[in-house]
Regions:
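Active-site beta-strand termini and strand-to-loop segments that position acidic
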Residues: 531-536
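Cysteine-nucleophile active-site neighborhood
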Residues: 58, 62-66, 380-475, 480-483, ...
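Extracellular ligand-binding/catalytic regions of CAZymes and related secreted enzymes
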Residues: 553-590
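Intrinsic low-complexity, disordered N-terminal segments enriched in polar/charged/small residues
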Residues: 2-4
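Pocket-forming structural segment of enzyme catalytic cores
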Residues: 111-120, 427-529, 565-567, 580-588
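Flexible phosphate-sensing "switch/lid" loops adjacent to ATP/NTP-binding sites
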Residues: 20-21, 30-363, 369-386, 393-394, ...
């Protein structure tokens, strides 16, 4: 028996073929655990997809991760992306969506945001591997002579590198590694990944691996039927690559019945209890409970020979809190990429998390930055309770963002700026309060007389675009008694960054004399990391991306305070409106 005292659980010896985890166990066996821990082989779950992309494999994998964690297991997650880009850092937001930044500076797929929010673990750049990064490593090894003159081929060299990336996460402090394979079975670029995970079974043992395949069960309107044929063809394609799925997760608009499950079971050679239905849900945080009711985690534990009790209580409490969040609040998101809302996925989820905390249902009003002038003209901006100005790159839409920041400042509308949002709020203040009419960022105007935002010194000679920004977690020292300091309630905080430009500190004294507070700086005081206004309910911004650290049960402090201020503004507006109505009614009677 291997005791894991520090986790409060026990795990059985690999020779017994079963991992057994029990809560609340203590005893004098810490040394035995340390001596024999290396014998325990972490379990692996591979999640593939078929029929169509964007089926929600990432949410399925994330929900499974949460369910396994609630069984006391130590879980980590990974995304394998078949595209040839080295990472998504230079990809167009309209094509890829959000770039999720990890603490160690990895620019990764947005699914890692789902992973972190669901399993409540900080992941690293190792949790995202692309075809581009894998080929880059293989070619670098060839140039070094690591292959000793052999012909470099997809099999074994590329597949070996893929397996190395998977195995890299299987450390001593992990019980289960969940790996999502991006793309769709049948795509030509996914073939090396399928071959690698097929081979992986023979290397770690059948009892240590589980294949989960996600498919679509579409509803055909004219016939009024749910169709299983796409699932059958997808599984046939997967089996032709040497992989027999242990479980099939069927995405559908409406629940599927036992009759369809029996049909899929018979056609795809999977036990009926291993055919899992993932129908559409009202909110994504319900999904772990629904998948548990379908038996997803139970059947995976059976495949992997894991015996671990489940405690769903905390997650049920979270979902109950989500369902009870009904107080309306309208937040305007002033963005450059609002046509693809996934470009702001973590911002959206962070706003929702803050809403859960306050019992509020956040309505996000999507506003294209270039359209702000028209919205101001017809007063639609006045219906907002709060504003978020998120990050982005390039000059398009900047003047609209600046006008939104001005509107929020002048009308006392709570406003939170993120990364580029902090920069445009700085420019707005310089122009309209300090009188620097042509103030700008040198990203947008190299000839400005007042470069209140300028490129960082160590970025001036950088020419490559990929992976060269100020990336990852950096510390900031907060000013006590400020809105930011009070929100965090910590003197020093760590946030994730992704930028090349910064507040130009040569202007700092002029800003501060006018009530503009630099409420957080880098430990060496060289970089301004947080700003706020002294005489405003909430006009706050950060050079960081705090949205990457919010959790559904622990909203980020800045988003929490934004929603709190927005609710207060809404309550005041409604109270004022009622008072005006009563006064008008009294005047009419008199």
């Amino acid at each position: 028996m291997i005791d894991q005292v520090d986790r409060g659980v026990h795990a059985a010896s690999p020779s017994e073929g079963m991992l057994i985890f029990r809560r609340g166990v203590s005893g004098p066996s810490r040394e035995r655990s340390a001596q024999r821990r290396e014998q325990v082989v972490p379990k692996h779950v591979f999640v593939t997809g078929g029929v169509a992309s964007s089926l929600g494999k990432g949410l399925t994998a994330s929900s499974l991760g949460r369910l396994l964690k609630m069984r006391g297991l130590r879980v980590t997650m990974q995304k394998l992306d078949p595209y040839i880009n080295v990472d998504p850092g230079t990809m167009n937001p309209f094509e890829h969506g959000e770039v999720f930044v990890t603490d160690d500076g990895g620019e990764t797929d947005l699914d890692l945001g789902h992973y972190e929010r669901f399993i409540d673990e900080n992941l690293s750049r190792s949790s995202n591997a692309t075809t581009g990064s894998i080929y880059q490593a293989v070619l670098a090894a060839e140039r070094r002579g690591d292959y000793l003159g052999r012909t470099v081929q997809v099999i074994p060299h590329v597949t070996d590198e893929i397996k190395r990336r998977i195995q890299r996460l299987a450390t001593d402090d992990v019980d289960v590694v969940i790996t999502e394979v991006g793309g769709t079975v049948g795509d030509i670029e996914i073939l090396p990944f399928l071959e690698a995970i097929r081979q992986f079974k023979n290397e770690v043992g059948r009892d240590n691996i589980c294949y989960v395949h996600g498919t679509l069960v579409p509803f055909i309107g004219p016939s009024g039927e749910q169709k299983t044929k796409p699932t059958q063809h997808s599984v046939t394609e997967l089996r032709s690559r040497g992989i027999q799925p242990d479980l099939i997760v069927c995405r559908s608009e409406e629940p599927i019945g036992d009759q369809l499950k029996r049909k899929i079971s018979g056609q795809c050679d999977v036990d009926q209890k291993n055919v899992i239905n993932a129908a559409d849900v009202k909110n994504i945080y319900e999904l772990p409970l629904i998948l548990h009711d379908e038996g997803l985690d139970t059947q995976i534990c059976e495949v992997l020979k894991i015996d671990a009790p489940l405690d769903l209580t905390p997650w049920r409490q979270l979902v109950a809190r989500v369902e009870a969040s009904t107080a309306p609040v309208r937040i305007g998101l002033i963005g450059k990429y609002v046509q693809l809302q996934d470009a702001y996925l973590s911002v959206v989820e962070s706003l929702k998390h803050a809403g859960f905390h306050h019992g509020a249902k956040v309505e996000i009003v999507w506003i294209q930055a270039e359209d702000v002038e028209g919205l101001l003209a017809d007063d639609r901006m006045t219906t907002l309770d709060g504003i978020v100005i998120p990050g982005g790159f390039g000059p398009r839409g900047i003047e609209g963002k600046i006008r939104a920041a001005e509107f929020a400042r002048e009308n006392l509308v709570p406003c939170l700026g993120l990364c580029l949002g902090m920069q445009v709020m700085t420019v707005e203040f310089a122009r309209h309060v300090l009188g620097m009419e042509d103030a700008n960022s040198t990203e947008f105007d190299l000839s400005t007389q007042h470069p209140v935002i300028d490129i960082m010194n160590d970025q001036r000679d950088v020419t490559d675009k990929g992976g060269t920004m100020r990336l990852g977690a950096y510390y900031a020292v907060l000013t006590p008694g400020t809105k930011v300091g009070n929100a965090y309630a910590e003197p020093v905080v760590s946030e994730r960054h992704r930028h090349r430009y910064e507040f130009n500190s040569t202007y700092r004294s002029r800003f501060e004399e006018a009530g503009f507070i630099c409420s957080g700086t880098s430990p060496d005081k060289r970089l301004v990391e947080f700003i706020e206004l002294q005489d405003h309910p909430f006009w706050v911004a950060t050079q960081a991306h705090p949205e990457f650290k919010s959790r559904p049960d622990r909203p980020h402090p800045l988003f929490r305070e934004l929603i709190g201020a927005a609710l207060a503004r809404r309550a005041l507006t409604e109270s004022t409106s009622r008072s005006a109505d009563r006064a008008a009614s009294a005047d009419a009677k008199s």
